[in-house]
From Swiss-Prot:
Gene3D superfamilies: PRC-barrel domain (2.30.30.240), RimM (2.40.30.60). This is Ribosome maturation factor RimM. The PRC barrel domain binds ribosomal protein uS19. It is found in: Cytoplasm. Binds ribosomal protein uS19. GO terms for cellular component: cytoplasm; ribosome. It comes from Kineococcus radiotolerans (strain ATCC BAA-149 / DSM 14245 / SRS30216). It comes from the Bacteria. The gene is rimM. An accessory protein needed during the final step in the assembly of 30S ribosomal subunit, possibly for assembly of the head region. Essential for efficient processing of 16S rRNA. May be needed both before and after RbfA during the maturation of 16S rRNA. It has affinity for free ribosomal 30S subunits but not for 70S ribosomes. InterPro entries: PRC_barrel-like_sf (IPR011033), PRC_RimM (IPR056792), RimM (IPR011961), RimM_N (IPR002676), RimM_N_sf (IPR036976), Transl_B-barrel_sf (IPR009000). The lineage of its organism: Bacteria, Bacillati, Actinomycetota, Actinomycetes, Kineosporiales. Belongs to the RimM family. Keywords: Chaperone, Cytoplasm, Ribosome biogenesis, rRNA processing. PANTHER family: RIBOSOME MATURATION FACTOR RIMM. Pfam families: PRC_RimM, RimM.
Length: 174
């Protein structure tokens, strides 16, 4: 199975650097010089030549892609890795696609619903949960609200504020 670790953005300068939208928790290792990444759509493998951070944005150059014109053709290309080729992750490591279908429960074990998706790429990640009442609930994916993810046990533990999953008294019903 392939997993997207980044998306190539716009060129930066005239020497073949591109901005990269990072989608991995270890970019310094994943994009180290010499790292080989597959592309989607398939444009052949890309080998990282240089990597540096500039104002919070990762800038990469690739071997054989040496100027702005050449790198412009990579815009919006997804950089992917094959999960089967990856080293065994930590016991508590997970990938976003593994959350789909997990039970969403409170810290006391009360069922809240089922995880539908994890939206990434915005200001912060957002967990999409289909509540027990069928409504879709968006939960900011931050530790105070999502204290634990347990893929092996098939659950995501949530500590939602009052009213997020249960209607508050006085709210109109849909």
């Amino acid at each position: 199975m392939e997993y997207v670790v980044a998306r190539v953005g716009r060129p930066h300068g005239v020497r073949g650097e591109v901005t990269v939208e990072v989608r991995t928790d270890d970019p310094d290792t994943r994009f180290a010089p010499g790292a080989v990444l597959r592309t989607d759509p398939d444009r052949g493998p890309l080998t990282v030549a240089t990597a540096r951070w500039h104002n919070g944005t990762l800038l990469l150059t690739f071997q054989g892609v040496e100027d702005r014109t050449a790198v412009e053709g990579l815009r919006n290309t997804r950089l992917v890795v094959d999960l089967d080729d990856e080293a065994d992750p930590d016991d508590d490591a997970w990938y976003p696609h593994q959350l789909q279908g997990l039970a969403a429960v409170t810290t006391t074990g009360t069922p809240l619903g089922t995880v539908k998706d994890l939206l990434t790429g915005g200001a912060q990640d957002v967990l999409v949960v289909t509540g027990t009442d069928g409504r879709e609930v968006l939960v900011p994916f931050v530790t105070p609200l999502v204290p634990r993810v347990d893929v092996k046990r098939g659950k995501v533990v949530l500590s939602p504020p009052g009213g997020l999953f249960v209607e508050l008294p006085g709210e109109p019903e849909e």
